Structure formats: C-alpha cells, structure tokens
Amino acid sequence: MSERKQAPETPWYLRPFGPLVSLALLCVVWGVYGKARLSGRRTRAQRAWQVVSQGCVYDLGRDLTRHNCFRYCNRGSLSSAYFAQATAALSDGYIYLALTHSNSPAGEVIGLFTGRAYNHISLAFDRALKTLVSYNGGEGGEAPGLNPETLKGLAERKGASVRVYRLVATRHQKQIMLKRLRKINQEGSAYNLLGLLFPMSCQPNIMFCSQFVYAMLRLAGLHYFRKNPLQVRPTDFVEWDRRGRLAFVAEFTFDGVCLHCQDSIPQMRPTAG
C-alpha cells in the first residue's frame, strides 16, 4: 500500500503567501462586485456580495496555510486498493466525469469567477464511482493535491448536486490514464491555488481539478475540444461538447439527510463558439 504523507510545514519564506492570496482574492471579489454594480448586472453583484458577507473568502484564506503552490505536498494519496479497483474496471468501455455543485466556500469563490454553479470536476474508471479521483484542497487531514473522492463526500453539503457523464474509452486509453495516475501518486502533487488567479503552474503535477481532468483526457487522446489546460473550467467539458461525445448517466443530490439519484434531467447545452 502506498505511504500517505501529510502536508509538510510551510517554509517560513512562503508563510506570507497565504494572507497575500487571501487579500488578493478579497480585492478581486470586491472588484467584481463594483464592476457588476456599475454595469447594472444585479445578479452578479448580489452573488459577489454574498461571497463576501458569508465569509467565503475568509474561510478560504484561513485554509491557505495548508497549500503549497511551489512544491509537492501530497504523495501516496492513492492506495493499492484504489489501483486494484481501477484496474478491474479497465474493460468497462467508458471513463466517467462527475461535475459537482458543492456549495463550499472555495466553490462559491470559484463560481463567482467562472459564472457557473458547477465548480468541480472529477473522473472515475468505473460506473459505481468507486474510483473517483481529482485534484482538491484535501479533506479529513489529506494534503491538497491529487486525492481519491467519494460521491457522498462530493454531495455532503445541503443543496449540493453531482452530475455524472460517461465518455467512450478503450482499455488502452484507460491504461494510459491509470499509468499517469501512478506516476503522479509516486512523484507527488499539490493543488494549483495560484492557477485560479493567474494562468500558471509552477510544476507539472501542480494542478486544479479541471486542469487535471483535461490533461488526463488529452494524454489518452480522449479530449474533444482544444483549450489551454490552465483556462479550462469544469463546465467546459459539457458546454464544449459540440458533437455529443458525453452521455448523461445520473444526477445525485443531497437534501441534508439522504442522497438522491435521478437518471433523467435536461442536459446543459453547448455554448462555446
């Protein structure tokens, strides 16, 4: 089983980075609010005010000390059991994408920038979603970076929802992606928090969720639109699907008590020009 390592203590010379990014985020959000007010975009202004008033930026800023945008802080997060499950699903015929509306502080801030409600994306090798994986901020002591995920974990907040899609993939294509996952798991990773503000990544394995999913699909020759990975938004995988490559599987919602599944909903329409 892979050895799981927690995030190392942030070096002294990087410690001011967290508060600075938090301040930058707050300034950007206030800028969005002011611009929306001046341009008469009432809905966007209300959303920016909500992000500030609910303390989303503060909550996100408080969590910044766990992140490291310059070196890998996550290694061995995927266990041998995970890789065994993924290997068993290689002949499934599909790769699965899970698009999440999370209602988390990070999700609210990201949603303000992207203008989309769905703000996180993951991939899985099996229909049961036992092999969900993505880049995230880490939960339950996990270091930010490449981490396994669960459907329940994605939809744990009241009002959250997860839309699942499938994309045809051969065994060989899934093997390519799985091999890459093993390499990242061994080399290490970190969440590209800086990339949410600026189109940059300091090291190859420092990514955010949509950057990671797009890179994996492109590596296996499964990407169906062309875009700079650093500019890919989670909803682009649906909105840029001009040829109908994705097939909707189900939507999962959480009402605060139970997880509900619905297998028929109106699909998002492609909007990319």
Regions found by a protein language model. Give the residues of each.
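Cysteine-nucleophile amide-bond enzymes
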Residues: 1-273
